[in-house]
Amino acid sequence: MSTRLIRLLHLYKKTNSRSFYTTPKLSDMFEYDKKSGYPFKSDYLEEPKTVLERIREGYSQLKHELWLFKEEVKDSLHMDPIMILRPGEVDVVWKFDGNPETLDNWVISTDRDYHDGRSYATLELTPSGSGLFSGVLDTVALKDGKKRQTGYCNIKTVEPRKSFYRSDVHDWNGYTHLIMRVRGDGRTYMINLHLKAFFDVMWTDLHHFALYTRGGPYWQYVKIPFSKFFFSNRGRIQDRQFSPRRNSVVGLGITAADGIAGPFSLEIDFIGVECDETFAEESAYELYHPPHPYYV
């Protein structure tokens, strides 16, 4: 009986079949690194210091942290939160006003920093005081057998924090739009919203939307609803979409990675948020899920 059953199984065996493409399986049940294996730039750019130099640096940091703590106490005693969001009024969050210290609020990263490509970028102030994000995209992959696609440059804001290195967030609850005043080169850039992650599986969550620039000498006023941002994890757009949690924003990034090799240039005046009371859209994407018990 068993021999006959085996023969029948061989008769019904499928040949020349193609399996579904699947992503590599996870080797762990948890994420041990917030950067998914990519090192922080400070991990290998920090210069070696002596014990005396570290003591001096720690003393200067202590003075700055005490000043931050004093400002926090003042704000808590004033108890003056934003109670009314005026329609049409833009609350500027990041502004390039010609002060070189504004560049310290941004971190530049390229594929060259992680030995994944040859692109490079800079962020500097223009003679008029605005910020200029420029560089060269190189889409030729390195011949190391590891990467097939390359060519990206990115800038990201430094995560807000309180005194003594306590984490903080940008509370944009009540705002409906992201406002930018930029002057581009005709390329398409990607805006990335980074949210505070509570669990390790959420460390690679991002919300994106495209930034279309016209090029030319004129400034461009960009108004993007938060409901237009789509959700992704590890660079893959997810089936289940939801609007970003506007009370948990920890950073904003701008990425140049449109696949076109050559120089790029994006001039930024300011980035802010606005409340539009006439806008009531919750999400621009389908939120319906079939009522199937095994739907994931």
State where each predicted segment sits:
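Beta-rich carbohydrate-recognition modules and glycan-binding surfaces
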Residues: S2-V296
